[in-house]
Regions:
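C-terminal or otherwise distal, non-catalytic regulatory regions appended to signaling enzyme catalytic cores
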Residues: 125-141
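Charged, amphipathic alpha-helical regulatory modules used
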Residues: 1-116
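Intrinsically disordered, low-complexity regulatory segments in eukaryotic proteins
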Residues: 110-130
Length: 141
Protein backbone atom coordinates (compact mmCIF):
# COMPACT_ATOMS: atom_id res chain seq x y z
CA UNK A 1 0.00 0.00 0.00
CA UNK A 2 1.25 3.49 -0.78
CA UNK A 3 2.37 5.58 2.18
CA UNK A 4 -0.30 8.25 1.74
CA UNK A 5 -3.04 5.60 1.53
CA UNK A 6 -1.83 3.92 4.71
CA UNK A 7 -1.59 7.29 6.45
CA UNK A 8 -5.16 8.13 5.44
CA UNK A 9 -6.44 4.86 6.90
CA UNK A 10 -4.52 5.32 10.15
CA UNK A 11 -5.63 8.95 10.50
CA UNK A 12 -9.23 8.02 9.76
CA UNK A 13 -9.11 5.40 12.50
CA UNK A 14 -7.04 7.18 15.18
CA UNK A 15 -7.19 10.88 14.29
CA UNK A 16 -4.55 13.26 12.98
CA UNK A 17 -2.66 13.35 16.26
CA UNK A 18 -1.36 9.84 15.53
CA UNK A 19 1.26 11.56 13.33
CA UNK A 20 3.10 12.59 16.48
CA UNK A 21 3.01 9.17 18.13
CA UNK A 22 5.57 6.36 18.05
CA UNK A 23 2.82 3.82 17.39
CA UNK A 24 2.35 5.37 13.94
CA UNK A 25 5.32 3.33 12.75
CA UNK A 26 3.69 0.05 13.78
CA UNK A 27 0.45 0.96 12.05
CA UNK A 28 2.26 1.89 8.84
CA UNK A 29 4.29 -1.32 8.97
CA UNK A 30 1.04 -3.29 9.34
CA UNK A 31 -0.18 -1.70 6.10
CA UNK A 32 3.18 -2.44 4.44
CA UNK A 33 3.61 1.27 3.71
CA UNK A 34 7.40 0.95 3.54
CA UNK A 35 7.66 -2.03 1.23
CA UNK A 36 8.25 0.07 -1.90
CA UNK A 37 10.64 2.57 -0.32
CA UNK A 38 12.20 1.19 2.88
CA UNK A 39 14.35 4.31 3.37
CA UNK A 40 11.18 6.36 3.93
CA UNK A 41 10.66 4.45 7.19
CA UNK A 42 13.55 6.33 8.82
CA UNK A 43 12.20 9.68 7.60
CA UNK A 44 8.76 8.88 9.03
CA UNK A 45 10.31 7.71 12.30
CA UNK A 46 12.19 11.02 12.60
CA UNK A 47 8.95 12.95 12.04
CA UNK A 48 6.79 10.82 14.35
CA UNK A 49 9.21 10.67 17.26
CA UNK A 50 10.44 14.26 17.13
CA UNK A 51 8.77 17.61 17.56
CA UNK A 52 8.10 17.76 13.83
CA UNK A 53 5.05 15.51 14.06
CA UNK A 54 3.63 17.61 16.88
CA UNK A 55 4.14 20.80 14.89
CA UNK A 56 2.52 19.32 11.77
CA UNK A 57 -0.51 18.32 13.86
CA UNK A 58 -0.73 21.73 15.52
CA UNK A 59 -0.49 23.62 12.24
CA UNK A 60 -2.98 21.29 10.56
CA UNK A 61 -5.64 22.28 13.09
CA UNK A 62 -4.64 25.79 14.22
CA UNK A 63 -3.09 27.47 11.17
CA UNK A 64 -3.95 28.35 7.60
CA UNK A 65 -3.08 25.98 4.78
CA UNK A 66 -0.45 28.49 3.64
CA UNK A 67 1.25 28.47 7.05
CA UNK A 68 1.13 24.68 7.19
CA UNK A 69 2.61 24.36 3.70
CA UNK A 70 5.40 26.84 4.52
CA UNK A 71 6.31 24.75 7.55
CA UNK A 72 6.10 21.53 5.51
CA UNK A 73 8.55 22.94 2.96
CA UNK A 74 10.95 24.05 5.70
CA UNK A 75 10.65 20.61 7.34
CA UNK A 76 11.68 18.92 4.10
CA UNK A 77 14.77 21.14 3.95
CA UNK A 78 15.56 20.44 7.61
CA UNK A 79 15.28 16.67 7.13
CA UNK A 80 17.75 16.86 4.26
CA UNK A 81 20.16 19.34 5.84
CA UNK A 82 20.19 18.12 9.45
CA UNK A 83 19.35 14.43 9.11
CA UNK A 84 21.00 13.83 5.72
CA UNK A 85 17.93 12.18 4.20
CA UNK A 86 17.65 12.24 0.42
CA UNK A 87 15.45 15.07 -0.81
CA UNK A 88 13.11 12.67 -2.64
CA UNK A 89 12.43 10.67 0.52
CA UNK A 90 11.87 13.75 2.67
CA UNK A 91 9.49 15.16 0.04
CA UNK A 92 7.61 11.88 -0.24
CA UNK A 93 7.15 11.49 3.52
CA UNK A 94 6.09 15.09 4.26
CA UNK A 95 3.84 15.37 1.19
CA UNK A 96 2.18 12.06 2.05
CA UNK A 97 1.42 13.32 5.56
CA UNK A 98 0.08 16.62 4.22
CA UNK A 99 -2.21 14.88 1.77
CA UNK A 100 -3.40 12.33 4.35
CA UNK A 101 -4.13 14.98 6.97
CA UNK A 102 -6.22 16.76 4.35
CA UNK A 103 -4.56 20.13 4.78
CA UNK A 104 -4.55 20.92 1.12
CA UNK A 105 -5.68 19.26 -2.05
CA UNK A 106 -2.91 21.25 -3.76
CA UNK A 107 -0.25 18.86 -2.48
CA UNK A 108 1.05 16.48 -5.11
CA UNK A 109 2.88 13.42 -3.86
CA UNK A 110 5.79 12.46 -6.07
CA UNK A 111 7.13 9.00 -5.38
CA UNK A 112 10.89 8.58 -5.09
CA UNK A 113 10.78 6.28 -8.13
CA UNK A 114 9.69 9.28 -10.18
CA UNK A 115 13.17 10.72 -9.56
CA UNK A 116 15.12 7.68 -10.67
CA UNK A 117 14.78 5.64 -7.47
CA UNK A 118 13.21 2.33 -8.25
CA UNK A 119 10.76 0.75 -5.90
CA UNK A 120 12.06 -2.34 -4.16
CA UNK A 121 11.32 -5.44 -6.16
CA UNK A 122 9.65 -8.32 -4.37
CA UNK A 123 11.49 -11.62 -4.15
CA UNK A 124 9.82 -13.94 -6.62
CA UNK A 125 11.75 -16.97 -5.47
CA UNK A 126 13.98 -16.84 -8.53
CA UNK A 127 16.45 -14.39 -7.09
CA UNK A 128 19.93 -15.79 -6.99
CA UNK A 129 19.18 -18.66 -9.35
CA UNK A 130 20.39 -18.64 -12.91
CA UNK A 131 19.01 -20.45 -15.88
CA UNK A 132 20.92 -23.34 -17.43
CA UNK A 133 21.74 -21.13 -20.41
CA UNK A 134 23.25 -18.44 -18.15
CA UNK A 135 25.25 -21.09 -16.26
CA UNK A 136 26.58 -22.51 -19.50
CA UNK A 137 27.59 -19.08 -20.75
CA UNK A 138 29.37 -18.31 -17.51
CA UNK A 139 31.31 -21.58 -17.72
CA UNK A 140 32.35 -20.93 -21.30
CA UNK A 141 30.03 -23.48 -22.76
Amino acid sequence: MKLQEALRKVIRQFGGSVIQEKRLMSFLADYKAFDDYPAVKEVMRAIATGDWGKELCRLATDASDADYLRYAESLKETLVRERNFKQEFADYAVDSISLAIGVSSQVTVTEPGDHGYEAVRKNTGEQGSRSAQEKGSAQGG
